[in-house]
Amino acid sequence: NKPLAAFVAGAGSGGTFVGIQKALQDAYPELKGYIVEPAGSILNGGPAHSHRTEGIGVEFIPPFFKDLDYTGVKTISDEDAFYYVRWVAKNLGLFIGSSSGAALAASLEVAKELPHGANLVTVFPDSSERYLSEHIYEE
């Protein structure tokens, strides 16, 4: 039973990340928290531009982010997010949305940075049901 080492979640308005991060840090003070954003969001210092990953990403930094204790930001391309949407559907039979695909891609990056066997948790906030007309399962 190892303690939780990392939390990885997308941020749109920031509410999900902030609420869960604070609760988990109370229980696990050494917890590393990583925000997931699509390429085109500005949290990592890049310029804002359009992206296809729905539900996460910001065009301005919300004021409460200044006081938030997080380890880093993982920027995930639309291509990687949608790759994992398709991978999860094909291999696990789950219909996740693009922000969930981005969360998985970022979680895999973070897992490589953690010690072997460390525990990590993420959030899959969306399903792909509302995006089926956008042909997200086509390669």
Residue ranges of each PLM-predicted region?
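Residue-level marker for beta-strand->alpha-helix junctions and adjacent short loops that shape enzyme
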Residues: 14, 40-41, 127
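Phosphate-binding loop/pocket of nucleotide- and phosphate-handling active sites
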Residues: 59, 105-139
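Short glycine/serine/threonine-rich phosphate/pyrophosphate-binding segments
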Residues: 10-21, 99-107, 131
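Local beta-strand N-terminus motif with an aromatic residue
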Residues: 3-4, 70, 117
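Short beta-strand segments
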Residues: 9-10, 35-37, 121-125
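Active-site/ligand-binding loops adjacent to catalytic centers
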Residues: 25-98, 135-139
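Glycine-rich ThDP/TPP pyrophosphate-binding loop and its adjacent helix/strand module
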Residues: 1-31
